């Protein structure tokens, strides 16, 4: 039998020698090159809409929000802003062409300053321009300081499916320290009406507030839980740059006291049947915010309106 000799064939242009090592994950320049990463599918898509006006700029707020102070109490330029939002969305359509939107979040500012008729037109424009899922979650942020008895129901009729109420606290002294325009009684009335008008809603609560004790924090939380909300967002007060609080820092609880507050929050929300599913959000079964989850799971979102931004994925 003839001996078998190993034969190596080098095709023209073929690389000789061992295969090169794959670039390290930290080589951002490499991985950002078009075509380097191929997506087998795209994540869910959400829509964020920013309405920038509020009655009063809170001293801790670093969002793109602006007090509406017009001579003679002139009304908000609702129609002009809605025209601009529609144009913004139309200009963005090539970025999301054909993709379905599974959640909408209308934030601010104070979106509840806009009339229910304006919100109705806004959502009509959205439905006319994008593929909105039939069961899409549509959240509107509301301030108890803009609460009127029939207003929340009118937002529901306009197509809003979920209300997020910026309560922050039920304690009048703490609300005053935060620069809020509502008091505890208004907050309670707003929550009661939201529970009547909506199948699901969220309460925003803050802790580690100026002058707040552990007992104060627990009282706020027990009041909130007394309304049996399906969802609560609980935020530690943060002193952000370029805010009034950054320029004039208030006296806030020590870190150990704030940790004790968080431990109590975790205990009380768990006992009330609210499961923590992200850093600041607690929900009953079936009431997690799809919009929040999409953010935390690195989904896609298109932002329209003053100061809004987007995060979008493309196949290549």
Where do the model's predicted regions map?
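Intrinsically disordered regions, especially transient/low-confidence alpha-helical propensity segments
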Residues: 8, 22, 28, 50, ...
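Local cysteine-cluster metal-coordination motifs and their immediate loop/turn environment
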Residues: 50-65
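C-terminal scaffold of the Radical SAM
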Residues: 35-46, 64-316
